[in-house]
């Protein structure tokens, strides 16, 4: 059974091919109109202006050919559904029109064989152009019609059977080349579509830099694994009571503004966005690409999120809107990571396990401890002396038999970073 990602790829590829067929149909019709316009102008000049009867005989049929070409272009613009079948116009319009014009030219030409040979070149060009339809059936139909028209002209020109068969072989070779070109175009479109979908899927979870590295490593489909990571949960304080005072569209606007700012901070520190849980944010560091500094990045991200919230609140205050407060919990430990969900409907690359649960519990403790950020001992030990730490009283959390040691971090000042002593 094809999974959801596979169906999405196939559906997107089908839409991409249909869109490309539409663009190619319009471009091909414009090329035909310009080409027929140029030849019609030449025919009018030599036939009507210069009075050359051998050119004047072409003017009425070529004017009719030009009119049909122009009407075809107009129809493609007005009726988009016709673009999918635009390749048939090569077989139903161009091939018969060229045969008609050359049929008229045969009695007037001193070299009927030359007329038939020139027509062979025109038909070969049409076959190659039919590859732009991105449909092999169209190319084969154009080739068959061109072969019939070319053989008929050569018979009228009294050219030998061997030459007629050779002409068919030449047109067949052109068809083979056109089909190969068509295959290459479809392959390139498929590859480009798959890469774009892969980039879009990765971009949902990972920062642009991480997504690019994963794509270079061809790791869009990550395998399940147990890995040490740093989990971060962020939650808006008193969001329920705040949302009850707002209209639905205001709630959505608030969350979009808040999440937009916070996700940029997360990605700036190389974090992986796991999910939005109402007004909460779940992020982890150190996966899917290993990062020995995941604890430090997680703590710095938490500090920068609190700082970014000050910018958000300044904008909200200027608009007369209430300020927001957040609580952030950070914990480091082993977690199971992989694509979890329905293989036929929806899969999400996520982290599960006790580490995730404890990180969420630590975030909840920020409400009772009245601090914006709390981190576990494991995170504090791995992040090291990059930050200053204040140890809080251990806290009891559901699911743990022993109280959990928690710390609140803050950035060092420039003087402290230079090595000056500072109080913890």
UniProtKB/Swiss-Prot annotation:
Regulation: Inhibited by adenosine. Activated by GTP.
Reactions catalysed: ATP = 3',5'-cyclic AMP + diphosphate
Cellular compartments annotated: Cell membrane
InterPro entries with a match to the protein in the record: A/G_cyclase, Adenylyl/Guanylyl_Cyclase_3/4, Nucleotide_cyclase
Cellular component terms per the entry's GO annotation: plasma membrane
Cofactor(s) of this protein: Mg(2+)
Biological processes annotated in GO: cAMP biosynthetic process; intracellular signal transduction
GO MF annotation: an example: ATP binding
Identification of the protein by name: Adenylate cyclase 1
Membrane topology classification: Multi-pass membrane protein
PANTHER family referenced in this protein's UniProt entry, alphabetically: ADENYLATE CYCLASE, TERMINAL-DIFFERENTIATION SPECIFIC, ADENYLATE CYCLASE, TERMINAL-DIFFERENTIATION SPECIFIC-RELATED
Family: Belongs to the adenylyl cyclase class-3 family.
SMART domains the record matches: CYCc (SM00044)
Enzyme class: lyase
Residues where Mg(2+) binds: 235, 279
Annotated Guanylate cyclase domain residues: 230-363
Native source species: Stigmatella aurantiaca
EC number: 4.6.1.1
Sorted UniProt keywords: ATP-binding, cAMP biosynthesis, Cell membrane, Lyase, Magnesium, Membrane, Metal-binding, Nucleotide-binding, Transmembrane, Transmembrane helix
């Amino acid at each position: 059974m094809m999974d959801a990602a596979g169906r999405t790829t196939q559906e997107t590829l089908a839409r991409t091919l249909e869109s490309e067929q539409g663009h190619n149909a319009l471009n091909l019709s414009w090329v035909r109109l310009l080409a027929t316009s140029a030849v019609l102008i030449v025919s009018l000049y030599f036939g009507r202006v210069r009075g050359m009867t051998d050119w004047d005989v072409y003017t009425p049929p070529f004017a009719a050919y030009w009119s049909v070409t122009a009407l075809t272009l107009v129809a493609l613009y007005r009726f988009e559904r016709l673009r999918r079948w635009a390749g048939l116009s090569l077989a139903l319009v161009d091939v018969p029109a060229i045969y008609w014009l050359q049929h008229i030219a045969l009695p007037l030409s001193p070299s009927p064989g030359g007329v038939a040979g020139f027509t062979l070149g025109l038909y070969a060009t049409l076959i190659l152009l039919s590859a732009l339809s991105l449909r092999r059936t169209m190319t084969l139909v154009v080739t068959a019609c061109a072969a019939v028209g070319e053989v008929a002209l050569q018979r009228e020109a009294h050219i030998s059977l061997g030459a007629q068969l050779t002409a068919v072989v030449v047109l067949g070779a052109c068809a083979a080349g056109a089909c190969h070109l068509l295959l290459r175009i479809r392959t390139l479109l498929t590859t480009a579509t798959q890469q774009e979908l892969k980039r879009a899927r990765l971009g949902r979870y990972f920062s642009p830099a991480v997504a690019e590295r994963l794509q270079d490593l061809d790791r869009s489909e990550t395998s399940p694994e147990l890995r040490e990571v740093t989990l971060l949960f962020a939650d808006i304080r008193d969001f329920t009571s705040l949302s009850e005072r707002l209209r639905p569209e205001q709630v959505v606007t608030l969350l979009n503004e808040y999440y937009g700012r916070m996700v940029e901070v997360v990605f700036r520190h190389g974090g992986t966005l796991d999910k939005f849980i109402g007004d909460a944010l779940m992020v982890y560091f150190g996966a899917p690409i290993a990062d020995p500094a995941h604890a430090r990045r997680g703590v710095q991200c938490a500090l920068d999120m609190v700082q970014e919230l000050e910018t958000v609140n300044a904008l909200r205050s200027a608009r007369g809107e209430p300020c927001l407060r957040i609580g952030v919990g950070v914990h480091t430990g082993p977690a199971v990571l992989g694509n979890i969900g329905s293989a036929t409907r929806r899969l999400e690359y996520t982290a599960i396990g006790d580490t995730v649960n404890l990180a969420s519990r630590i975030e909840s403790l920020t409400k009772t401890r009245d601090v914006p950020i709390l981190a576990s001992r494991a995170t504090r030990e791995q992040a090291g002396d990059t930050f200053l730490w204040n140890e809080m009283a251990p806290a009891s959390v559901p699911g743990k038999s022993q109280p959990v040691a928690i710390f609140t971090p803050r950035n060092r000042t420039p003087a402290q970073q230079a090595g000056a002593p500072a109080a913890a």
